Amino acid sequence: MNKTENTLHKKTPSVTVLNNRGLAVRDIVYHRHPDTPDKTDERITRHQFDARGFLQQSADPRMQASGLINFHYVTSLSGQVLRTESADAGTSLTLNDAAGRPVISISQIRTDHGKDDRSVAVTHTFQYERSGSGRPLSIAEQIAGQSAVVSERFVYAGNSEAEKTKNLAGVCTHHYDPAGLMQTDSIALTGVPLSVTRQLLKEADNPDIAVNWPESNPQTLLSAEKFTTQTIADATGAVLNTTDAAGHQQKVTYDIAGLLSSSRVTVKGGAEKIIIKSVDYSAAGQKLREEHGNGVVTTYTYEPQTQRLIAVKTEHPARKKIFQDLRYEYDPVGNVLCVTNDAEETRFWHNQKVVPENRYTYDTLYQLVSATGREMANAGQ
């Protein structure tokens, strides 16, 4: 960090003010822009809590300077948020049952004129099993001025031997969502889905369709075509082989630490192709070298003290071709200050020297305020 940056950040601490209950009621930061280092702007974020210690309202520096707030919360006796008033998103309501599960939620309540306007509000109603584990059964959605529709339904497997064989007992096997049906055919002991089938709505091409799933025979709304993805996993739950709905297959292998070591893809009806041939890692699990099936090799270098990435080099050794050779510089907190590509040449244009590097500047809040670099004039041609 140079002298100018030291001066810029001088006397700009982050301060948190606590009340006598240990609750953070003020967050104070000091903003200074590199272009105006002599001007310091104090920015205060204000929080207010109720007598029980639950957050009641919050205002960011912009709003609190105007005497306004960003959020206002109304909570239940247990502290669950029942009503949220947002300066940007309007007002939303949430009512929970005795178990803490949402029963009704209303969003998009406008407050432009100082009072609630529900002309465009959306209401979601949740239904659960009345006995047993209380699993969700359906979600109904109602837009203001329209009839309610069931946008989602959940169907669970029973306890039969066939379902136990596929590890489906008690699992949600049929999820009817706004796009169609997502059906789980089998899962591994580790919980990894081994076979999943997707069916779309008959009117899936209509963007204005709002599905209303009936309680009986919801399959009548689905198209006949099914898309099945099958997976093979090992005893730890790591995916070894995936066959998608089009019949394309992807295989991956792992090293002794469980990190990806190779990847292969077989297009349906084609030969197997190597995507990632090998990967080397450091003791900390950071990628050091990656060799692809086309012979391209990427190497990574890290700073020993901070373990930050300081260099990435991509090349084709057989062709003696370097595609990129990036070097990174950071400030003490980890923001990227400079990225240099040694694979590119320094160019001269209109009596200007253009080096292959990007430089970034930040203010005292570590917000990006400027970025410079080289742009190829014919890049989009």
Protein language model features and the residues they cover:
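Beta-strand elements of repeat-based all-beta scaffolds
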Residues: 1-381
